[in-house]
Amino acid sequence: MSSTEAKQYKEKPSKEYLHASDGDDPANNSAASSSSSSSTSTSASSSAAAVPRKAAAASAADDSDSDEDIDQLIDELQSNYGEGDESGEEEVRTDGVHAGQRVVPEKDLSTDPAYGLTSDEVARRRKKYGLNQMAEENESLIVKFLMFFVGPIQFVMEAAAILAAGLSDWVDVGVICALLLLNASVGFIQEFQAGSIVDELKKTLANTATVIRDGQLIEIPANEVVPGEILQLESGTIAPADGRIVTEDCFLQIDQSAITGESLAAEKHYGDEVFSSSTVKTGEAFMVVTATGDNTFVGRAAALVGQASGVEGHFTEVLNGIGIILLVLVIATLLLVWTACFYRTVGIVSILRYTLGITIIGVPVGLPAVVTTTMAVGAAYLAKKQAIVQKLSAIESLAGVEILCSDKTGTLTKNKLSLHEPYTVEGVSPDDLMLTACLAASRKKKGLDAIDKAFLKSLIEYPKAKDALTKYKVLEFHPFDPVSKKVTAVVESPEGERIVCVKGAPLFVLKTVEEDHPIPEDVHENYENKVAELASRGFRALGVARKRGEGHWEILGVMPCMDPPRDDTAQTINEARNLGLRIKMLTGDAVGIAKETCRQLGLGTNIYNAERLGLGGGGDMPGSELADFVENADGFAEVFPQHKYRVVEILQNRGYLVAMTGDGVNDAPSLKKADTGIAVEGATDAARSAADIVFLAPGLSAIIDALKTSRQIFHRMYSYVVYRIALSLHLEIFLGLWIAILNNSLDINLIVFIAIFADVATLTIAYDNAPYAPEPVKWNLPRLWGMSIILGIVLAIGSWITLTTMFLPNGGIIQNFGAMNGVMFLQISLTENWLIFVTRAAGPFWSSIPSWQLAGAVFAVDIIATMFTLFGWWSENWTDIVSVVRVWIWSIGIFCVLGGFYYIMSTSQAFDRLMNGKSLKEKKSTRSVEDFMAAMQRVSTQHEKSS
């Protein structure tokens, strides 16, 4: 295998000794560039060793601990065999999220590490760069609460309340104000509970910092740190700013979980970057501060979150659009009524009462309350499934999601290393290779990393190796060396033989053996070919070798390992496809690893390096071609945070509703940008704050279950909105004609009760039995309005027939044994309440049984409306039972007609095309040619970029 092929074996330095070559890894490239840039400051590198430091490294203290009982350690690990480790395997890229940060000139970073900055220089830089803190935008809670009283529907409700107060109709005033307050309170509470991303980010920041100033090591408040400061890092230190390590020959382990969500510590050396809010686990070093405040990685993440959150939610747009159209219709109806009244010289008080009645019924005052309640009940149900909804509108967004951009580790995979079938050279048994690899592992529980845990857990499959392991005595143990990329242990066999065991990056282990003696050509070739094969398939691999006594080094073989897919992921992905959901994997891992994972899951293998998106200067595709490229890709590997943001943005510009999963601060911008941001199990507080939904259960199946539930909730909301718009149109048409033609109207109090009954009964739709759609759902507003208008017209015709046939001068159907107000109130109430049974069904109204809550609420309201009519409450007279029965029978007939119309409209593709302004019959030949040409263009683009 050539050196070029060897370098294609891509591994990550922060994942210990799994690496054959660091040259290809983007994280390493970032570190390398940092090193090269820091080398311009020769004084920093030459004098770093002269800086006064505290002695005693944490690792030295660790070595003083006695070895734990190996049997007990293995048993404890194997008792949890098959469970996911806490240590993440995905390397999350933290190169930056925003190209607009303020870059500190290199001359300001050339500080002498032995002396630090002078007090005068600190003052100058603080004036230039400001304090080391993130900018705050304090928004008054009162103003935020008052904003929930702003909107088309709210304006109409407020106008109606003022008009009712002018007419001294205090009952109406109270009802309207109560609905306004309910809507505002529910919305405000939900937004307040979601919290502030900036507040969560601030919780991760340090309070103090130890720096060198004027040659003295002093402790200062963290917000006084300035760029160019020499800052001390030691075990337990929380980095107060971004910086670059200037101490040579240092070795730090940094906990970046507050940023990346990954619990496995990252290794840092001379020239590497350290990010604000990272915690030093072991080691000591000094760093030069490169960015402070809003210019740090955390600060830029918060800024990008702010940019993403400035867009109005899709659900809010829909409700506002509906409200505006209804407001226009109300104004048109009022103009008709006013014109008729002026020609008849109707009194001003009567005109105002007519105006109040049209205003109340013209705009669904309870629409926000019912929809909010429906989503709140759905959110409570999702919480029982360990999905915490932080923003109610996210339920509607999730129901319409067409593409899910998912991370790999923990969501698609188990988040634990698993060993696969080992490759052994001729004459070596798998048990022998496993024994040697486990001998070269730490015996301390605290010192175990993900690799050692995977080996010790897997001993259950190698009983001979497990039995032999306890018989060896460890004489020396040398943990992972970042230079030689190996772990070394010197042990004594039961026979007293001294054996040196190593495991590490395969090519480095091979080099160790080759330096001792020539390896047979066939063994050498087979070994390298196996390493190359594993690399191409995305496996990480460990080479294993040993040296017995004074003999030669022996190459034993290679142990491949991988973070395996979750057991339910492949099945869940198939289910997602059946639900019309496309899944794209975005991972920080190498392309080979990403492709192998996708192959095992059946996700597709069109996986590309994220550099092709062009953010790092590697892309040259024009806008439309880039959009096609992203749309047809199955995923991207080696992604930085800005790549995730860009992918979401491109897909949204193509008209897709996109969901994004994430767990770290670096994911916060893309979580906020996505239509539905999903914080997965174990996410940082900042990621949770930026997300719309937080999942406490691991895996993709939890997300798919929530998606199905959200579609059920959407079905309830959609059916209610169709129902409620139809009711408003019904009464606008009917009352408008009644006033304009007959100069009469229903009593204003009964109009208010009709509005209240309509919303009180349907509040329980939140608990209704609802199906979930087999594909992403959308509002399809033209179709929604078409159905609502037709249903409203049918209702208006039914009411007009009731008015003009039951009350004739010489005796109608009711033959004057009933009060007009009471009979019309009952007929309107019954037909409107029953309409919900029509719109809630996916097919004929009898095909789906409503929940007992909805059926009970509607029946209860019907009984109350009947009592109103029988006893003449708010009517001029009582109505006999025979007339009431006739009204019920007539209303049932109207209900059946409504059901027939709705079924035809909901199943007719021609109606859908007509409402959306398309021809009734699609020209298939033209459409087929267009689809074929578009597909060929996309395939050509994909082939060109993959070659």
Curated annotation (Swiss-Prot):
Top-level lineage group: Eukaryota
A biological process from GO: regulation of intracellular pH
Matches recorded under CDD domains: P-type_ATPase_H
Listed Low complexity bias regions: 26-61
Reactions performed catalytically: ATP + H2O + H(+)(in) = ADP + phosphate + 2 H(+)(out)
SUPFAM superfamilies: Calcium ATPase, transduction domain A, Calcium ATPase, transmembrane domain M, HAD-like
Compositionally biased residues, Acidic residues: 62-74
Catalytic class of the enzyme: translocase
Annotated spans, Disordered: 1-103
Subcellular location: Cell membrane
Keyword tRNA processing (UniProt): no
Primary subcellular site in the record, as a coarse category: membrane
Cytoplasmic side of membrane: 1-144, 190-320, 377-748, 804-853, 904-947
Transmembrane stretches, start-end: 145-165, 170-189, 321-342, 354-376, 749-767, 784-803, 854-874, 887-903
Catalytic residue positions: D407 (4-aspartylphosphate intermediate)
Summary of the function given for this chain in its UniProt record: The plasma membrane ATPase of plants and fungi is a hydrogen ion pump. The proton gradient it generates drives the active transport of nutrients by H(+)-symport. The resulting external acidification and/or internal alkinization may mediate growth responses.
Homology family: Belongs to the cation transport ATPase (P-type) (TC 3.A.3) family. Type IIIA subfamily.
Entry protein name: Plasma membrane ATPase 2
